Swiss-Prot record:
Protein known as: Small ribosomal subunit protein eS1
Name of the gene encoding the protein in the UniProt record: rps3ae
Taxon lineage: Archaea, Thermoproteota, Thermoprotei, Thermoproteales, Thermoproteaceae
Superkingdom of origin organism: Archaea
NCBIfam families: PRK04057.1 (NF003142)
One Pfam family linked to the record: Ribosomal_S3Ae
Organism: Pyrobaculum aerophilum (strain ATCC 51768 / DSM 7523 / JCM 9630 / CIP 104966 / NBRC 100827 / IM2)
GO biological process terms held by the UniProt record: translation
């Protein structure tokens, strides 16, 4: 009898979904990581929580801070945990808009780009691109020296902090300010920005949480 009731209920759900695909969807509230205050990011629909796992959401840093100067900073977050109708995220990447980068590069200045991989204290691996703009043109030797110093600073800073602390310093502008100080010892600077970040590997503890979530959802299905 119980099996028959389940079969009937399943048929009813299928019939409803065919008439209106949105009828069975739930709305989940998505939140930023705790080091960003766990602020609300958006609401997303899904038939079940499992389908939300690993979904990527893109927002502007302005959406979190309400600081107009943060509009050009695009962030990517990945849903890695679901608690009821609450979806929790982890940082996935950052990128400055092309229009903003073009606005920084002016005639008579030099652009210095430093790209490196860093590893945080808790094991997160990221590829980071830093963009430095000088007040006037500089030579190849100065560019190389500046690039080397910025990379050394990035690697050292990452190794001293866990991923949450490191990302917080990036998003608050603290790391860019530190890099500006390092760079201006070599040449006068107009601007230093973290231009792009891509997460290559998450901390082991964080990966374990994702695996547990996925297993729990499959088991309960």
């Amino acid at each position: 009898m119980a099996e028959k009731q389940k079969a009937v209920a399943k048929q009813e759900k299928v019939a409803i979904s065919k008439r209106d695909p949105w009828a069975l969807k739930k709305w989940f509230s998505v939140y930023a990581p705790s080091y960003l205050g766990g602020v609300f990011l958006a609401e997303v629909p899904a038939n079940e929580a499992q389908k939300l796992l690993m979904r990527t959401l893109e927002v502007s840093l302005y959406d979190i801070t309400k600081d107009i100067s943060h509009l050009p900073i695009k962030l990517k977050f990945q849903i890695h945990r679901v608690e009821g109708l609450k979806a929790l995220t982890r940082f996935k990447g950052l990128e400055l808009t092309r229009d903003y980068i073009r606005s920084l590069v002016r005639k008579g200045t030099s652009k210095v780009t430093a790209i490196t991989e860093v590893k945080t204290k808790d094991g997160m691996v990221m590829r980071i691109a830093v963009l430095g703009i000088t007040t006037h043109r500089i030579g190849t030797a100065q560019k190389s020296a500046m690039r080397k110093k910025m990379i050394e600073t990035l690697v050292k800073k990452a190794a001293e902090l866990d991923s949450g602390q490191f990302l917080k310093e990036i998003l608050e502008g603290t790391l860019a300010a530190d890099l500006f100080i390092v760079a201006k010892k070599i040449a006068p600077m107009r601007k230093v920005e973290i231009a792009k970040i891509k997460v290559l590997k998450y901390p082991p503890e964080e990966e374990q949480i994702v695996v547990k979530e996925a297993v729990a959802e499959v088991t309960s299905a």
